[in-house]
Regions:
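Conserved, mostly hydrophobic/aromatic
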Residues: 67, 91, 131, 144, ...
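Glycine-rich, aromatic-flanked loop segments that form ligand/cofactor-binding clefts
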Residues: 123-128, 132-168
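Metal-dependent enolase-superfamily TIM-barrel catalytic cores that perform enediolate-based chemistry
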Residues: 149-264
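Shared catalytic-loop signature of beta/alpha-barrel
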Residues: 241, 252-371
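Hydrophobic faces of well-ordered beta-strands that scaffold small-molecule active sites
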Residues: 70-72, 161-164, 189-191, 215-221, ...
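Metal- or metallocofactor-binding catalytic centers and their adjacent structured scaffolds
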Residues: 47, 63-142
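Flexible C-terminal active-site loop/helix
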Residues: 2-24, 33-42, 308-311, 325-396
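Non-catalytic terminal accessory/regulatory regions of metabolic enzymes
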Residues: 1-69, 88, 188
Length: 396
């Protein structure tokens, strides 16, 4: 008998969390190289994107009509209070007390409410993603099933991961950090480089020389290459057998990425900036603009992730989820999606973020021997102790 995916929502509430005593997303990576900081934000020299000085995130709690509770989290580290406002003041009123056939019907309903006004991305879709994750978590708990088993009939029981970022101040410290992870069974790592390809190649060569046991390297330039430097980077990183070259050009540059994919060198990976199927579909059609698709579950939710993955698969493009900044709820949701993702790529893993909730989060996900096993727990595999969230709650 197929699982019951219908739902009726009793209540929805979102909470803004901040971890002010923790290290930033960048930790000590390239510290002292001209970074600019404000009270909440940080700009790293060489990149355009703003980052949070300390981890902030919006959690969403959904209670179904039968009392089952689920938790969700959006990947919205900059301005999580915006997601909270959208959830608490707008979306909650639209769905509380309503019945839906399944989470897809809920997602479509909420998307339709504002699509005619152009709200097809950004914080509005982040809020939808957080609610979607929470709803699937609640349904999984009600049905006594991991979410992955609700998404696909035979999820992977185990998968291996790569470390996202080697965030230490000096090259030698970065080498030592990678080698310490290799000793745990890790097979791959992704490094963040600027659009300066000469400097990037020097960094990569130094790491490869200092950590020769690592099997796979990935490179992410965070959208900072020109067309010329991206073409050179694709070639040079390809010569070094980089598994993929991530986010080379500006995220709106469809034509540029299409041209780049056709050039020789490392495969091109991207997708974290897309919220919905409607944004990504053109990018995987011929001439395609990417070789590896990387949706971010904190922006797509489970429901649209599965649709996006299928669209990419029909175009012959494998999917491996992106994992950005967030805590155990977002990470657990991402790992559930990894269990049903394309097996040919290692799964991204943020090694230092999953424990930020400390005792407030009881997770069944445990890194061991270079990867994770799908926990024998219902929902996303995480239980939240609300009473212990109090020290992290930001009240505006």
């Amino acid at each position: 008998m197929p699982p019951n995916l219908s739902l009726s929502i009793q209540s929805i509430r979102s909470i803004h969390l901040a971890f002010k005593d923790s290290a930033s997303y960048w930790e000590s990576y390239r510290a002292g190289e001209g970074d600019r900081q404000t009270e909440r934000f940080e700009f790293k020299r060489g990149w355009q994107t703003v980052y949070a000085r300390y981890i902030e995130t919006p959690l969403v709690k959904v209670t179904l009509s039968d009392g089952t509770v689920g938790w969700g989290e959006a990947n919205a580290g900059i301005g999580p209070e915006v997601v909270c406002l959208i959830v608490n003041e707008l979306l909650a009123q639209m769905v509380e007390g309503r019945e839906f056939e399944n989470p897809a019907a809920l997602w479509d309903f909420l998307y339709d409410t504002q699509r005619g006004r152009g709200y097809s991305s950004g914080y509005w879709l982040d809020a939808l993603a957080a609610i979607d994750i929470a709803v699937w978590d609640a349904i999984g708990k009600r049905e006594q099933s991991p979410v992955a088993a609700l998404l696909a009939p035979e999820p992977r029981k185990r998968f291996e991961v790569y470390l996202s970022g080697v965030r230490r101040a000096t090259l030698q410290e970065r080498i030592d950090h990678v080698n310490s992870w290799i000793d745990t069974g890790l097979r791959g790592a992704k490094i963040f480089l600027t659009g300066d390809i000469e400097a990037g190649v020097g960094e990569l060569d130094g790491l490869m020389h200092g950590a020769p046991r690592l099997e796979q390297w990935m490179v992410d330039t965070l959208w900072m290459c020109s067309h010329e430097s991206a073409e050179l980077g694709k070639l040079e990183y390809g010569r070094r057998n980089v598994r993929f070259f991530e986010c080379p050009l500006q995220p709106e540059d469809l034509a540029g990425h299409q041209e780049l994919v056709a050039k020789p060198g490392a495969p091109i990976a991207l997708g974290e900036h897309f919220r919905s199927r409607y944004q990504m579909e053109t990018w995987v059609q011929q001439p395609r603009a990417l070789d590896v698709y990387q949706p971010d579950i904190g922006r797509t939710g489970f429901t649209d992730y599965m649709i996006q993955k299928e669209i990419a698969a029909k175009a012959g493009i494998p999917t491996t989820p992106h994992m950005g900044s967030g805590v155990s709820v977002f990470q657990a949701a991402t790992l559930q999606c990894a269990a049903v993702a394309s097996p040919e790529y290692l799964q991204e893993f943020q090694g230092g973020l999953s424990d930020r909730l400390a005792e407030a989060s009881d997770t069944g996900w445990e890194y061991r021997d270079g990867g994770f096993e799908l926990p024998d727990r219902p929902g996303i595999g995480v239980e939240i102790n609300e009473a212990l969230l109090e020290p992290f709650i930001v009240r505006n």
